Design a protein with these regions (language model features):
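Generic structural marker for isolated residues within well-ordered, non-membrane alpha-helices
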Residues: 58
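Short acidic capping loops at alpha-helix termini that bridge into adjacent secondary structure
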Residues: 69-71
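Contiguous, often N-terminal, cationic amphipathic patches that form binding interfaces
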Residues: 1-50, 55, 74-79, 83-106
């Protein structure tokens, strides 16, 4: 299982967010929960208060995926480190390649 999958008319992206980090970065590996579900590790320098870290995460995703923030929505995990983000654009090969490229190589 990957940290993303086609979902409805778009894509579901699973993220493990680490706020208050030294730098904004996408991780080189994934977090796997007890059920085997993968989450891409992402760190942001912003603190986790009043949704600031979530906003920073969406900005990072928008910039790297070249998608408007308005096309993304955190559908699960507003106040948790484990998040599910719905990307409301067609799941194409191009989008899949961009998502794969988020995971940095070690």
């Amino acid at each position: 299982m990957s940290f993303f999958e086609p979902y409805k008319n778009g894509c579901l992206l699973r993220i493990k967010l680490a706020p208050n980090a030294a730098k904004n970065a996408f991780g080189a590996d994934v977090f796997v929960d007890a059920s085997g579900t993968e989450y891409l590790k992402v760190s942001v320098v912003t603190v986790a208060e009043k949704g600031k870290a979530n906003k920073e995460l969406l900005k990072m995703l928008a910039k790297n995926l070249k998608i408007a923030v308005s096309n993304m929505e955190i559908i699960c995990g507003q106040t948790d480190h484990l998040k599910k983000i719905f990307i409301n654009i067609s799941f194409t090969t191009e989008l899949e390649q961009k998502l794969v490229s988020l995971k940095k190589e070690k």
